[in-house]
């Protein structure tokens, strides 16, 4: 049984500040995406890893050790996130992949235990996604003022890697018109059941400048491998 990981790193996000997209900025001396790749390369249940990049980032990507050594395959992304994922899925078609994990390149702190849980969840469901229950109070705002509250019962903060049986999510992407926020949306549009798996608070997506400092603190607190 072959499990592939797709690391989506084709975005041009600038909210993190700096001259480079967030996935190429340094985190404790390494590009964010290099740390993300390392997590999946070390996962015993992952047999193949694809990195989806923007064409302008090819030189940076080819300089990554995992890419230079041939252990990670590059795929150029599309005009949107779902188009980028579709390109990677098509690159895996016909190559004997049973399961696929789709992960944000800007989530470098994904834990091995979470990767394992996601793969195992596919024994019982065609799709699975990690999530953390919403614990903060939720407000509705208008014009800079609070105008109401929102019941948080049953609400979750979505994370990645989102896991799917390969042929099911490939068919779902081929049928989807585009514009999905994530792969769970694509899967559900195709009628696929998606199980919720316990996520991890440390599995943050590096998005804003302050996220780098938090991620470095979390890395420092981790035991040495």
UniProtKB/Swiss-Prot annotation:
It catalyses: 2-C-methyl-D-erythritol 4-phosphate + CTP + H(+) = 4-CDP-2-C-methyl-D-erythritol + diphosphate. One of its GO terms (biological process) is isopentenyl diphosphate biosynthetic process, methylerythritol 4-phosphate pathway. The record marks 152, 205 as: Positions MEP for the nucleophilic attack. Pfam families: IspD. CDD domains: CDP-ME_synthetase (cd02516). Pathway: Isoprenoid biosynthesis; isopentenyl diphosphate biosynthesis via DXP pathway; isopentenyl diphosphate from 1-deoxy-D-xylulose 5-phosphate: step 2/6. GO terms for molecular function: 2-C-methyl-D-erythritol 4-phosphate cytidylyltransferase activity. Keywords: Isoprene biosynthesis, Nucleotidyltransferase, Transferase. HAMAP family: IspD. Belongs to the IspD/TarI cytidylyltransferase family. IspD subfamily. This is 2-C-methyl-D-erythritol 4-phosphate cytidylyltransferase. It comes from Cereibacter sphaeroides (strain ATCC 17025 / ATH 2.4.3) (Rhodobacter sphaeroides). The gene is ispD.
